[in-house]
Amino acid sequence: MKKRVMILGGDGFCGWPTSLYLSGKGHEILIVDNLSRRNIDNELEASSLTPIQPMGIRLQAWKEVSGQEIRFMNFDVSQHYHRLLTLIREFRPDAIIHFAEQRAAPYSMKSSWHKRYTVNNNLNATNNVLAAVVEAQIDVHIIHLGTMGVYGYGTAGMKIPEGYLKVKMEADEGQTVEQEILYPANPGSIYHMTKTQDQLMFAFYNKNDRVRITDLHQGIVWGTQTENTRMDERLINRFDYDGDYGTVLNRFLMEAAIDYPLSVHGTGGQTRAFINIQDTVRCLEIALESPPEPNERVKIFNQMTETHRVRDLAKLVSELTGAKVDFIPNPRNEADENDLYVANDSFLGHGLKPITLADNLLEEVVDIARRYVDACDTSKIPCSSYWNKEREISQQ
C-alpha cells in the first residue's frame, strides 16, 4: 500500500537514501530538514569526501531520473513546533520517519556548547514530533532511528535482546515477581544519552496517548551508495571521514586511500555492530510496512547485521589495501575490550538478506575512497574531541 511519509532529517546520510528509496517504491515523500548537517560542515571546515549538491539540485535530479517528485520544507523541528504541527495537519502522513537529530558522538563531546546543542536539538525534536502527533489527533506511525549505543558497550555476558529484558525480582514476602522492562541504558556519550531519553519519551507517549512507535536501534552504518543514489552523481550520498563524523570504517578507508597508517584507538578491542546503508533503507521499508497494532507497546528492532572488533576491521582493510596499522591513545572513555552479542531476529524474520563487509568492502574502497581521494583534507582525519580532560592530556 502506498503511503504518505514525512521524513524528518531527509537531507542527511541515512535520510537522503531512505527518501529516494521510498519515493522509488511509489510512496509520497515530504522531507523536512533545516540543513544543519551542511552547516556543521561549515563549522568544522570538513566536508563530505563525495560531492554533495544543494538540495534543490538533488531534488531536480531525482525527478529527472525517476519521474517522482519529493517535496521539501526547510525548518527546524526542534524549534518550530507550530510549523511542524500545521504541516502534519495539512499533509496527514501515514508515517513520520524521524532522523532529525545530531548523530555524532564525538561532536556531542567537543565542548559544553556541543553537549548542550545535542541535548536541546535531539530531545526537543523528539518531544515536538510526539506532541504534534498527539495534538493533531491523527493516527501516525512514528519510526525513529535510534542506536545500538543505548545498550552500552560493556560485555553483558548474554545476547542483547531487542529492546526489552525479562527480569525476576524478589518481593517482600520472598516470592519472585517477573517483569519485562526496557533494557537498562548505559550511554557512552551525550549523543547516546539523548537516544536513551528518546526511549523514555516513546514509552510514555505510547502508554499515555497510544502513539504507535517503532524504535530502530541501529549499528554503525558503512557504505555510501544505494541503487537510487547511483542513478546520477547529483544524487550521491555523503562519505564523512573526519574525526567527528567519520565512522571508524570510513576513517580506515580514507587513511588507506592516502597511504596513511590506519589509526586504531586504544587496543582496538572494542566490538561494534555494523550495517550496510543499503540494508538500512530496506529496514526502514520493513518497519514502514509492519507498524505496531493499536495499543501495542513500542516496537523495538535491533537494526544491525554483523559485529566486529575494531582491530579486526583494521586488519581487513590492511589486507585489502596494504595499509599499515597504528595504535594510538583512545580519546573516548570506554572499555578497551568488550564482547557484543546482539539479537536481530526481527528483521531477519521479515526477509532481510544482509550485505556483509566480506561482500562489498572492496567496492567501497575503489568506488568511493580512491575515486574521490583528491577531495580529502588529511588534517581533518584525526579525532579532536575528547571525552574528558584526562583523555585530552593523555594525547598530548
Model-predicted segments: where are they?
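Glycine/proline-rich active-site loop of Rossmann-fold NAD(P)-dependent oxidoreductases
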Residues: 196, 208-211, 223-250, 258-260, ...
